[in-house]
Structures are given as structure tokens and as C-alpha cells.
Amino acid sequence: MEQSNRQTAEPAIRSAETVDSTINSFQETDLKVQEKEDVAAAVQTESASIDSNEQGQSVSANTNTQSQAKKLSNNSHQEPMQMVSAANKERAVLETAQNQKNGNMINLTTDKAVYQAGEAVHLNLTLNNTTSLAQNITATAEVYSLENKLKTLQYTKYLLPNESYTTQKGEFVIPANSLANNRGYLLKVNISDSQNNILEQGNRAIAVEDDWRTFPRYAAIGGSQKDNNSVLTKNLPDYYRELEQMKNMNINSYFFYDVYKSATNPFPNVPKFDQSWNWWSHSQVETDAVKALVNRVHQTGAVAMLYNMILAQNANETAVLPDTEYIYNYETGGYGQNGQVMTYSIDDKPLQYYYNPLSKSWQNYISNAMAQAMKNGGFDGWQGDTIGDNRVLSHNQKDSRDIAHSFMLSDVYAEFLNKMKEKLPQYYLTLNDVNGENISKLANSKQDVIYNELWPFGTSALGNRPQESYGDLKARVDQVRQATGKSLIVGAYMEEPKFDDNRVPLNGAARDVLASATYQTDAVLLTTAAIAAAGGYHMSLAALANPNDGGGVGVLETAYYPTQSLKVSKELNRKNYHYQQFITAYENLLRDKVENDSAEPQTFTANGRQLSQDALGINGDQVWTYAKKGNDFRTIQLLNLMGITSDWKNEDGYENNKTPDEQTNLLVTYPLTGVSMAEADRIAKQVYLTSPDDWLQSSMISLATQIKTNENGDPVLYIQVPRLTLWDMIYINETIKPETPKVPEQPQHPARTLEPAIPQTPEAVSPLPVANKQAVDENKNEIVSALTGEENDLQLPTLSKRSLSISQAELPQTGDNNETRSNLLKVIGAGALLIGAAGLLSLIKGRKKD
């Protein structure tokens, strides 16, 4: 693998002298600061919790007056840049911002989780007039593709003091055909009063994807512990509440777990069935409840996958085929005696027997059974499962001890899947390759997506080691990408409390359960980050109608999904929401034909101490730093493991602290080997950073940079990173950006010059009389405008030395510039009139002289 052997970095890059000199250069440059007034902060401080009683997600943000630093050039080998203050001052600024957070929140939802190309995006939010004046309250939504602002939308409503209004479908819309296919977008929304004071603010991702398989965001739906792991109609309100939140987390595909009657009769067309094979909870499934959930999933634009084993027959049901079609053990082991039918047992009680995947009779039977089941339930595909790998024999060789007559089940999975795809061409299909160790055998199978359930005891893709670290998760994601070109879906279950038969806890997570504790928030987020940064997707979210969800969305803790004994805190639910926004908004940077980069970035503290120790990510107590590359861009992933271990599952629970030491004022070096100095200077102007963590919540900021050379004369990019909580992503845009011509005399915010339909109510000693409310309501001003191509692009925040606040650097703007063209025509037209008038006056004067 590309990253299994790290090369020694150039001595000139790695030397403490070079790093120290660069840090001094960053900190000692005297800046002249050009203040800009009334610029809203793109940096969002820590949000208030999601209100579990409302559907959708609420986001709060702080706004600050910003300052813009002028770009200065240090020398001929350095990039003109905005410099950053000393670490101690910067830390004080960040802490102050944390303390200044307010409780104003946007309740922002969309009508779907994902959109087809050409579909309009309907936004739903509540405008609140929290002021003492009756006035126009305006919602402004800016649509971004990476650093580029594409479009600005506004919706204005005249509201009395303390009055609220929730937009209806069709009132606040991103127009159809505005967004490209297979792209993630960030929607930055703020609500302001008539004086442009920001009242509320929040970010939300939008996904436009005709094909969910490109960027799968997979979640589970399972039975409720309230009713013995059953799926019942009476619990639909709880499921709907979770699905509404998951819609706003942009989930585009769902895995319906254990809603089947039996492995050979998965979903019969009956009102209700018992899962008689399930002796531990005797679960029931009401088919109308399942169909209602499938329908709700479809309404959000997502797909519904029916879970079932690919080879199994439940032990308590009559065989559907003769013994000749079973598979038999070659060796005695966990699946029974050699020469016997392969059997899976729990507590020595048989649960499932297994058929031969090469059996034509079985292939015909199970394909027909699944086709009928998916038709009955309205499902879109089959989430296949296996019990693991085993060396087996066909019936006619079941007594043989010759290994040449045997085969591994994994050797024939691809053939079986391809046969199923031929027989079920209208349905999606995927298989759980447990631990992902058989990708070389499955790479050419006709799976629509690749799904692996990973366990620490599995063998890592890095080699002869268990896959227990964050780096092992990345290695598996990398391996699947290299073999198939697909983004791996990872079932990685968190903490997994374990008890003995007497309910005695066997690990720290189990002791947390007995203490009624929650998941450790950062443990869950770091696993999600490790998988997503590598280009995969962590399937951890689940709708389980479980009281332990705390009004939020469930998190999977073990392979039997209805079991969720740890609680989900409001903090974890809120942060899961923001991580899903990030993964969606930046899907093209994370997993759009993105590969490992051979460049080896390094991370240092402000005093020059190196924090990046191994790019493989198998060691803790470091800033795990590595690079990826895509089409005309590169990324540097920074994952904070400072002060914590690198194990991803965290079975120790709170006994193993997984909250790393937050880092500020970091310096990242990135070698640009083979790049000319002129090209390096250009690239250094296009370096940005974003993070799902509370300090940014997916906003993208420009970064201070310098270019230096190493001892070989190759340029090295030095990047200032203001803060690292858990996960930062540096984005380097390598495209050549054309200069955008400026339109003279264009207002910075043209929409704000619109006059209200009725005068703004002046300040009064007493509130408006109630008797006047109806008359005022009849004349409320409603304005909806779509603005594109504004002269001044959004200014993304960076840190300046003098102001010690977050400023915003102007970024290029793309997209449909109809408004700009319209304004240009107005300017040209006005100019033509002036020229014509001047010519006429000149002609008149000339005639008078004659």
C-alpha cells in the first residue's frame, strides 16, 4: 500500500530551525488591518442542544464584527498572506468566543434528505422577531460549493414583536436546475432584522445525487426494546421522529434489520408475523408498520434495503430443499463436526443451517423468495449477510478428507452475488463481508455498494496485526477504494458493553451501562471521522424507537441492532448532526475519486515540537496527519489523538478517556515536490480549512501560508492552522482561477436596499394595540428574491494578528450570474443615456455658437 512505508522527510523541512523560523515569521510580521463593518462571522461557536421535542435540527451560532488583514509578501520565496497572532493571544480569542455563545437557534429543515438533479430544494425554517419593533425579518441563504458561493436567496416577512412565522413549501426554494448532480453543497443561513443585525444563524448541507451508490450514507432501522425488539405500529411516532432527524442528517439509504419472518420466507404478505426463531425475545413484526417506514424513507428520497442472510435456513422451520443442497463442514469447529451440515448455534442451540451457494436449486429458491419479499414490502434492494467464512464441502464430497475437494465459502461469494444480480436486476444488492478480508475475491462481483462489518479481532489490511486502531479502519477503506473504486460502508459498532450470564460486567462499557451512562461522545465521533476522512462512511446511526436515544437518533453498539443499552446524549446527537452535514457538504473532497497522496505532511506546535508521528494512524498521542488527492485538489487530514489511545472501539468506555487535548496555532508543512516556485506561489493563495467541530460547523476558512524551499530547492508549503478539536481538513485547490472583473458602483448587499411594502414601525413607548393586529397582518410585506453573482463574495474567516478576531477573506464566486448581468445592463444602459445626453447638449451648444 502507498502509505505502508513512509519515506524520510527532507532534513530541511523537518529541521527545528526551519520550523522555528517559519513560526517566527508568522508571529512577528506587523500587519496593517483594514476594518470592515458588519461582516457576520463564518466561524460558529458551540451550539445549544437540539430540542428533542421538535423534528429537525436546531443550530445556534455566534456572530462577531470581523476584520480583514491586508496581504503582505515577506520575501521572494514567500506567499503574500494573512498572518496569525501568537498562540496565547489566539487561544484567548477562541475562549472568549466560546463564552459569548448565544441561545439563538435556527430550526432549519428540508423536504428531502437527497435530491435528484433538476429538483428544487424546499427550505423550511421559522423566522422569529425577537426584537421590540414590528419590522421585516429576513432569512438569507447562501449556497456554497466548496469555497465558491453560487447563489444567495432571501425570504422576508413582516413580523410584530415576538411574532414567529414558519415558511411553507414553495415559499423559500433553491430553484430547480440550480445545482449539479453528484455534488455536496453547504447552505449558510442567517436571519436578520431590518437593520441587518443577525438574530440567528446555522449551516446545513444539501446533496444532489441521482445515484445513492456514489456517496452512500447508510443507517439502520430495527426493532424497539420497549416491545421485545418488535416493529409495531404503535411505535411509529417514535420512528418517524428519528427518521425526520435522519432526513435532516442527509441519510440516503436504510438497512431494515431483522424485520424478516424467517430466512427462507423473509416478508410474507400478511398483517403480522412472529419471529419464532428468536427465542430470546419472541419479537413480532407488523407488516403495515414496516411498509409505513419504507414509505417514509422513500418520501425523503432515500432507498430501503431488506436484510436477510444469503444462505440460511432457520433451524426451527421445515427445509425448503433436500439435504443434497446443504453445505458441509470440512473441519470440526465452531460450525459443528466435520461432515455435518454447517450450523450456527447460540448456547449450543442451533439457530441456522446453511445451503451451498453453488447450488442452482438454492440460487433459484432464494432469488424468488427475496423478489417476492421485496415486492411485498416495497423495498429497493437486499442487504445480504453471512455468518463468516468457513472451509466447506458439497454434499457429494461431505465425507472426504482431501482438502482439494473443499473450498472456502468466500471463494464462491462473488459467483453467488453475480447470479443473484442476474436474477434480480431491478433491485440493489450488497453483501456483508465480515472483517473485509475477502475484497480480492469480491472485487469483481456485481455489488451495488460495498459493506463491511469490522471487528478489532479481524486481520488488518496493513498486514499481520488486528484491526483495532483508527489507522486499521483507514487501511480497509483504502483497500476497498483501490480494488473497486467504491466508497466503503463500515459497520463499526461502538463500545459494545459485555456481561456474563449473571449480568456481571466484563468491560468498562458494561460498567457504564450499570451507571446509566451515555456513549462517550468523542469516542463515537473519532471513529466516524477516521472512516470519513479516509473516504468511507461509518454506519452508526439507527432508528430503534429506543428510550435510550433520549429523543435523538440511536447509535449502534453491537451486531444485534435492537440492543442499545448505552444512552445517547443530546451533545452526541447534536454533534452527529454536524458531522453528517460535513460529510455531505464535502463529499467531493472526501470520496469523489480521491486517492492517497504520496506527499508526507507534518504537524508542529507553535514552539516547533512535531506532533505527527505516524501517517498510518496506528499510534495514539499524536496529530494523525496524512494527505489525499483528487481531480485538481489535495487535502490534508488532521485527526487529533493527542493524549488518547488509538483504539477505535473503546470497549473500556469512560475508563478510557477519548477526548483529546485541543490544539491551537499549529503549523503544517506540505512538500510540493516537482512544482515550480511560481506554481507554488499560486497554489498557496488557495488553501482553506474546514471542520465539523463546533468552532466551524462546516464553514470553510482561508488560511495563512508561506512558501519556503528545502535543501533540494523544492518548494514547501507552510500552513497555519488556528485550531484542532477532533478533525480538521485542509483543502488545497490546484485549479487556475480566472480573475473576476469588478462591476463599478455595485452595492455590496443589493438585497438589503429593498424598501418594505409598509413603513417600518418606529420605536414606541407602548406596544402596538391588539386591535390593529388584523390590519397590520393584512399588509405584511413578503419578499422572496434570488440573488446571484454579487460583486462581493463571502469573506471566509482567518485570524489576524492585530485584531485577534476571526476575519473573512474574499473568495471567488461562480455560478449563474443573471443578477450581475442584469445590473451590468443597467449600468451600461445608464452610461449610454448619459453619453447620449452629453452628446445632445454638445450639439445644442454647437448650434448656438453657429
UniProtKB/Swiss-Prot annotation:
Residues 815-850 form a propeptide. It is a peptidoglycan-anchor. GO terms for molecular function: dextranase activity. One of its GO terms (cellular component) is extracellular region. The modification Pentaglycyl murein peptidoglycan amidated threonine is found at residue 814. Coiled coil: none annotated. It holds the Pfam family Glyco_hydro_66. Its EC number is 3.2.1.11. The keyword Metal-binding does not apply. It catalyses: Endohydrolysis of (1->6)-alpha-D-glucosidic linkages in dextran. PROSITE patterns: GRAM_POS_ANCHORING. It is found in: Secreted, Cell wall. Residues 1-80 are annotated as: Disordered. Residues 29-39 have a biased composition (Basic and acidic residues). A motif (LPXTG sorting signal) lies at residues 811-815. Its main location: secreted. Transmembrane segments: none annotated. Residues 18-28, 44-79 have a biased composition (Polar residues). Belongs to the glycosyl hydrolase 66 family. Homodimer. May play a role in sucrose-independent adherence to the pellicle-coated tooth surface. This is Dextranase.
